[in-house]
């Protein structure tokens, strides 16, 4: 009887350890680290992939929409949505843009996001000159809300419970 109780206690301990380890791995799957980029450049940059292409995006919870530089679309799989809109510059000039949907991955997790296509060359070149970082667009609040991501600057990670 004592042996049976010891075996039962051991089995319970093994199950608890297994659930804890599984929870830690699951948590890692739901995290995006931007710590290295933040240390190097001062910017929260995350590298996604689409096939062999590495896609560096700036995480910006203040941007309502995700935006991609028009020059980078040629090399990527994307599907225009047919939706168009105007973007107004600081000088008051209006530029017509369109939206496209782009699939990409981070580690083994797949995402699809609708991006506003804009010529970001001057902004990207200025950031590159100041910080040395090269990125192709901005992941905005639309993505963060859709996938329930929170930016944690204490841990330098974006994480989700979804």
List each model region and its residues.
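Pepsin/retropepsin-fold aspartyl endopeptidases
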Residues: 1-162
